[in-house]
């Protein structure tokens, strides 16, 4: 059975930020673009915010060592040295674990880290055992000089589930982490009991073919093929330098957060500091040229057609990159799903954490714990 509902924050948090009282007017909302997929060019250049997010080593100036509260949610304490580390294929992988109970595994988006779940981990840990890990190449995990593709992170999370979690769990992912969650669920059907997607990356086959045709003339024909690797490195080196500037990161974040109250120094610095890693530039180059330009190899319909567990779609409808049409299409394709509309942008878990936590906890109690008779969520 599929279910759909709309959750919005309280009137105050919907219209005003926790530290700002600027209303969000309809005209602002109308200016957002509702696209069904992330444009690879936009993601590589504008979204390069996060491409430099590869290893946070400094200490943000704003957060204290203790967890703080926002919108009723405790915030995970920032630790410049990280929390826990696990060795995977010779690489150091960073992760956080909090709470007890049914495990939840949180997977961040492109260029982010476990700290993007700062307002979710402790709240969810009041009822569940919550894991959040940094994907290889991002956050506190090693900046491995390997050939990156979607299956690298699928293999990483799959092994993390087997070696660290070791029991049935629900996997939750945002953006790139969402598509990774789907591929992990397909590969581990006996261990993944449910999947929750927050503005997931990924394309349907028809969209992928159409985009490939467009990019054959725009990117491949006129840029990629004629340009030699050295020139690519020069251009991407400049983009990397530009992307890691705090002012640029803040600007891009504000373009995908409708309520920008949570675009604070903590978040900006957690993305800008990673660029200090010696391998950051090379990882950026490999991600831009080898991963982002080959996303069409993996499609949502091919993955969803093999998945068997319940699916929750927590969707920021005002996302300028991945609009609500994508969520509706996924829901129509995969019938064992529930859709929750959120008045937020691309990162609803950080923009409206209270609404996300409530919706996720409700689904976990009503659907995952009772798979034989899922209920329609009402708000």
What residues fall within each predicted segment?
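Alpha/beta-hydrolase fold catalytic core
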Residues: 2-104, 126-129, 159-161, 165-167, ...
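Active-site loop/oxyanion-hole signature of alpha/beta-hydrolase fold enzymes
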Residues: 11-12, 75-90, 96-98, 125-128, ...
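Active-site glycine-rich loops that stabilize anionic/oxyanionic intermediates
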Residues: 101, 109-112, 175-176
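Serine-hydrolase catalytic-loop signature spanning alpha/beta hydrolases and amidase-signature enzymes
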Residues: 109-119, 130
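Alpha/beta-hydrolase active-site loop signature
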Residues: 111, 135-139, 202, 345-348
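Flexible "cap/lid" subdomain of the alpha/beta-hydrolase fold that forms the substrate-access gate
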Residues: 147-155, 161, 167, 172, ...
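Catalytic active-site module of serine/aspartate enzymes centered on a nucleophile-bearing elbow/loop
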Residues: 335-379
